[in-house]
């Protein structure tokens, strides 16, 4: 039984917000247990002897005078082997374990289980540099655990630890609580195991932040080619309902070039999380000749719309802390938050119950500051400790503004913070053009940062992208004229612009995420397709302009009649399957097509 003094008493209850008295001496954001069922809560306001607590579970049945137990520590997550492949709720309770314990599909109140299994034994290999008498500091790698084929889990010292090694465990099988290392510093000895506990609201420290310059390739042509994101960048995907936000964030977690994925479902439909749970184990990837499930590099934080509201706020912080932990191992982590609007709505509800002054649309005045403090935890960094390593956290936040209105406070606050904006368009989605990214309003501020990467690997790409954007922009301007006077009255070169823009829109920007050949498009294929499409445009413009003065003019109709087959081949470039055909064959096919086009136009001009 805890000392009497560590108890307060419930003074008032209003939904998820509980007021308690006799709480003097407790700290802001301290974790407390409310009532006889010991519900998890967090102190969010202190006034004199009274504390206001937001409770992360259903508060029905809590009465005045119920005990409130102070734990003396902030809301924290457990970090160690066993995170990958599991699914947690917003305060890192493992849903599978709860289901096994309770034999029920609902989470009962006051259930408390360990986030990481205490029974599972892991094969620990001690680091070569570690020996008794050596000196270590925070962030140093103690050893590694092969968690699965995809994740080699490095066991790190907590950032605050340092000292002289007095004991090192030999390699072997251990649980997460067994002592692996003992340090002595200033006469005090400390024991360390695989498990660390970290408060979710504090960002994990790093040595320094680096400039991000490696692209996050996500296998969607429109994103990789026109609006690239970097590893360590921040991205917002705002869009109305049914525009395909969830499909984009799921395909990012399936096919992007990240080492680990943290997927936070924050206040979205439960079906979407179960879809992820059903799809991901079936998806496989090749690692050193063995196929393994993609779920092995994914951790899910599920906080669906029917779970308590307050835990939504925590789930975003839980997710980003897990992501930072894997970043500290030197991995590139991508974190999907679907959707930050629901998180903002949770903030609004709690703020309303506290009686704070509402700002725009009833959201609290600190909405932008909270969003910024979350997005600023992304970035590419040099990790603490030795050996030297670099890691990154990329945040992709889906925003669902009511009615698809981008002037909504959450969307406008987010756009002021993030560097990449993938705006989804309801009209495109209704035309069944997916991914429904509007290429006229989206933007990416990482173009300059990525130029070096493109120059080194795909030197012609930057020019192609500029040309492609010009064609799409011109087509937008011409479409107004066409609606007034029809196509026939346009100049020949403008007709070519329109036709090529149509090819680019239908066969390059559009992508069917449910077919084997098109659900993932590697970057070489993206560049190859763009190169041929722009090549066709340049050749056609050239031959029309060169023969404009002579008797036998080449017009778009002539090109269309003579080149029907080549135009079809341009459209059919997307049907090349990168898995079945392989890179060399696809590159060769695209080069052959480019040659055929050049010959075709040469014969036409002769």
UniProtKB/Swiss-Prot annotation:
Q: What InterPro entries does the record point to?
A: ATP-synt_VA_C, ATP-synth_a_Xtn, ATP_synth_asu-like_sf, ATPase_a/bsu_AS, ATPase_F1/V1/A1_a/bsu_N, ATPase_F1/V1/A1_a/bsu_N_sf, ATPase_F1/V1/A1_a/bsu_nucl-bd, ATPase_F1/V1_b/a_C
Q: Which Gene3D superfamilies match?
A: 2.40.30.20, 2.40.50.100, Bovine Mitochondrial F1-atpase, Atp Synthase Beta Chain, Chain D, domain 3 (1.10.1140.10), P-loop containing nucleotide triphosphate hydrolases (3.40.50.300)
Give the GO molecular function terms: ATP binding; ATP hydrolysis activity; proton-transporting ATPase activity, rotational mechanism
Q: What is the protein name stated in its UniProt record?
A: V-type proton ATPase catalytic subunit A
EC number of this enzyme: 7.1.2.2
Q: Which domain of life is it from?
A: Eukaryota
Which family is this sequence assigned to? Belongs to the ATPase alpha/beta chains family.
- The gene designation is vha-13
Q: Which organism is it from?
A: Caenorhabditis briggsae
Gene Ontology biological process terms in this record? ATP metabolic process; lysosomal lumen acidification; proton transmembrane transport
Keyword set, alphabetical order: ATP-binding, Hydrogen ion transport, Ion transport, Nucleotide-binding, Translocase, Transport
Which amino acid positions bind ATP, per UniProt? Answer: 239-246
Tell me which GO cellular component terms the UniProt record holds.
Answer: proton-transporting V-type ATPase, V1 domain
As for what it does, the entry says: Catalytic subunit of the V1 complex of vacuolar(H+)-ATPase (V-ATPase), a multisubunit enzyme composed of a peripheral complex (V1) that hydrolyzes ATP and a membrane integral complex (V0) that translocates protons. V-ATPase is responsible for acidifying and maintaining the pH of intracellular compartments and in some cell types, is targeted to the plasma membrane, where it is responsible for acidifying the extracellular environment. Required along with other vacuolar ATPase components for the removal of protein aggregates which form in immature oocytes in the distal gonad.
Q: How does it assemble?
A: V-ATPase is a heteromultimeric enzyme made up of two complexes: the ATP-hydrolytic V1 complex and the proton translocation V0 complex. The V1 complex consists of three catalytic AB heterodimers that form a heterohexamer, three peripheral stalks each consisting of EG heterodimers, one central rotor including subunits D and F, and the regulatory subunits C and H. The proton translocation complex V0 consists of the proton transport subunit a, a ring of proteolipid subunits c9c'', rotary subunit d, subunits e and f, and the accessory subunits vah-19/Ac45 and vah-20/PRR.
> What is the reaction catalyzed?
ATP + H2O + 4 H(+)(in) = ADP + phosphate + 5 H(+)(out)
């Amino acid at each position: 039984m805890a000392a009497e003094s560590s108890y307060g008493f419930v003074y008032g209850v209003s939904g998820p917000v509980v007021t308690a008295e006799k709480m003097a001496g407790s700290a802001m954001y301290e974790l407390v247990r409310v009532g006889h069922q010991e519900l998890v809560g967090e102190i969010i306001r202190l006034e004199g002897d009274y504390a206001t607590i937001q409770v992360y579970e259903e508060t029905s049945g809590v009465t005045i005078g119920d005990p409130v137990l102070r734990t003396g520590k902030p809301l924290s997550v457990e970090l160690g082997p066993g995170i990958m492949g599991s699914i947690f709720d917003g305060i890192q309770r493992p849903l599978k374990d709860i289901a096994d314990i309770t034999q029920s599909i609902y989470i009962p109140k006051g259930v408390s289980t360990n986030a990481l299994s205490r029974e599972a034994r892991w094969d620990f290999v001690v680091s070569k540099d570690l020996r008794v008498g050596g000196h270590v500091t925070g962030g140093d790698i103690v050893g590694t655990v092969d968690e699965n084929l995809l994740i080699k889990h490095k066991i790190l010292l907590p950032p605050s630890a340092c000292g002289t090694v007095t004991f090192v465990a030999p390699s072997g099988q251990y649980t997460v609580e067994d002592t692996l290392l003992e340090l002595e510093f200033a006469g005090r000895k400390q024991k360390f195991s695989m498990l660390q506990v970290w408060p979710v609201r504090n960002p994990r420290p790093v040595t320094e932040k680096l400039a991000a310059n490696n692209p996050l390739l996500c296998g969607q042509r429109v994103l990789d080619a026109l609006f690239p994101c970097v590893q360590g960048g921040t991205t917002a995907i705002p869009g109305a309902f049914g525009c395909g936000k969830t499909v984009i964030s799921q395909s990012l977690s399936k096919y992007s070039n990240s080492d680990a994925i943290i997927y936070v479902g924050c206040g979205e439909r439960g079906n979407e999380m179960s879809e992820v749970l059903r799809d991901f184990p079936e998806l496989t990837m090749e690692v050193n000749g063995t196929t393994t499930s993609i779920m092995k590099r994914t951790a899910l934080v599920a906080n669906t719309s029917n779970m308590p509201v307050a835990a939504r706020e925590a789930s975003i912080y839980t997710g980003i802390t897990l992501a930072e932990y894997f970043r500290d191992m030197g991995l590139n982590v991508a974190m999907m938050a679907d959707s930050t609007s629901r998180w903002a709505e949770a903030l609004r509800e709690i703020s309303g119950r506290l009686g704070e002054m509402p700002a725009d649309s009833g959201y609290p005045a600190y909405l932008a500051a909270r969003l910024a403090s979350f997005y600023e935890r992304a970035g590419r960094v040099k990790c603490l400790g030795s050996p030297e390593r670099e890691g990154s956290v990329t945040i992709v936040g889906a925003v669902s503004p009511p009615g698809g209105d981008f002037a909504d406070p959450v969307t406008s606050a987010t756009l002021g913070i993030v560097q990449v904006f993938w705006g989804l368009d309801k009209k495109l989605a209704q035309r069944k053009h997916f991914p429904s990214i509007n290429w006229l309003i989206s933007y990416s501020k990482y173009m300059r940062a990525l130029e070096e990467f493109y120059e080194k690997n795909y030197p012609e790409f930057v020019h192609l992208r500029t040309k492609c954007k010009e064609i799409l922009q011109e087509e937008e301007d011409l479409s107004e004229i066409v609606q007034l006077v029809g196509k026939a009255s346009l100049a020949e070169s403008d007709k070519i612009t329109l036709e090529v823009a149509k090819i680019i829109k239908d066969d390059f920007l559009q992508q069917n995420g449910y077919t084997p050949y098109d659900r993932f498009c590697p970057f070489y294929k993206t560049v190859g397709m763009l190169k041929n499409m722009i090549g066709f445009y340049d050749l056609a413009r050239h031959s029309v302009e060169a023969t404009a003065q002579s008797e036998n003019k080449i017009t778009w109709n002539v090109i269309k009649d003579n080149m029907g087959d080549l135009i079809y081949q341009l459209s059919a470039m997307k049907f090349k399957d990168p898995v079945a055909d392989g890179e060399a064959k696809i590159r060769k096919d695209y080069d052959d097509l480019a040659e055929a086009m050049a010959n075709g136009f040469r014969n036409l001009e002769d």
